[in-house]
From Swiss-Prot:
It catalyses: 5-amino-1-(5-phospho-D-ribosyl)imidazole-4-carboxylate + L-aspartate + ATP = (2S)-2-[5-amino-1-(5-phospho-beta-D-ribosyl)imidazole-4-carboxamido]succinate + ADP + phosphate + 2 H(+). It comes from the Bacteria. The keyword ATP-binding applies. It comes from Staphylococcus carnosus (strain TM300). GO terms for molecular function: ATP binding; phosphoribosylaminoimidazolesuccinocarboxamide synthase activity. One of its GO terms (biological process) is 'de novo' IMP biosynthetic process. HAMAP family: SAICAR_synth. Belongs to the SAICAR synthetase family. It is an enzyme of class 6 (ligase). Keywords: ATP-binding, Ligase, Nucleotide-binding, Purine biosynthesis. This is Phosphoribosylaminoimidazole-succinocarboxamide synthase.
């Protein structure tokens, strides 16, 4: 098995099985496009376990993903896909960049979920782009754009209901998708507190990476508490 790719939070390896990859979650945490970064023991284990639980939950709701199975505390097997160079962001409540960009007050609840596309390009700092930009960049056609939005909203609905049952609010999240060899679009990458904003209903306590971004406590304790809440659903 050879290393195919190493990113900020994960390593991806080939396997002996055609079309199957091994993902290893690293004990690294970054914020601000890597401007802030640390090695934190145990972080990879938590993100792997959280992502595995969430992807299994989404599977029960008919959401197709690249996830196959968790194989160890820090590893999982996934289907090989060609990642679509978009971060698809779904917002239920205003927080983060949209409060600065459009002036919404933090905590403002949107009447309907908002879906945004960001172009995955480090040199350009992952800019917000429109549907027309997506087509001009030959990232996806009209049919695929519609499918990405539909899947994103289906994922949002399933996650909102899941978190609501444990007294949490899904503020926003970002996801990635990939294409299989036959052109099917699957949910890919991860869904974890690294990629979501999650607030406790009664206190607005964060269960996400904002704890690290804003130096407001232990990311390990925060993620472990969130994992414990998810495991209680099983």
């Amino acid at each position: 098995m050879s290393l195919l790719y190493e990113g900020k939070a994960k390593r991806i390896f080939s396997t002996d099985e055609d079309g199957v990859l091994r993902v290893e979650y690293k004990d690294e945490v970054t914020a601000g496009n890597g401007a802030k970064k640390d090695h934190i023991d145990g972080k990879g284990r938590l993100n792997n376990q959280i992502t595995s639980i969430i992807f299994e939950h989404l599977k029960k709701h008919g959401i197709k993903s690249h996830f196959i199975e968790q194989t160890s505390e820090t590893e999982q097997l996934v289907r090989s896909v060609e990642i679509i160079p978009l971060e698809v962001v779904v917002r239920n409540i205003a927080a983060g960049s949209i409060t600065k960009r459009l002036g919404f007050e933090k905590g403002h609840e949107f009447e309907t979920p908002l879906v945004e596309f960001f172009y995955k390009n480090d040199d350009l700092n992952d800019p917000l782009i429109t549907d027309d930009h997506v087509k001009l960049l030959n990232i996806a056609n009209d049919e695929e754009i519609a499918k990405l939005k539909k899947m994103a909203l289906e994922i949002n609905k399933a996650l909102v209901e899941m978190l609501d049952s444990i007294n949490l609010r899904l503020v926003d999240f970002k996801i990635e998708f990939g294409r299989t060899e036959d052109g099917d679009i699957l949910l890919a990458d991860e869904i974890s507190p690294d990629t979501c904003r999650i607030w406790e209903k009664d206190s607005d306590t964060n269960f996400d990476k904002d704890v690290y971004r804003e130096d407001r406590g232990s990311i390990i304790d925060t993620y472990q508490t969130f994992l414990n809440k998810l495991e209680a659903l099983k």
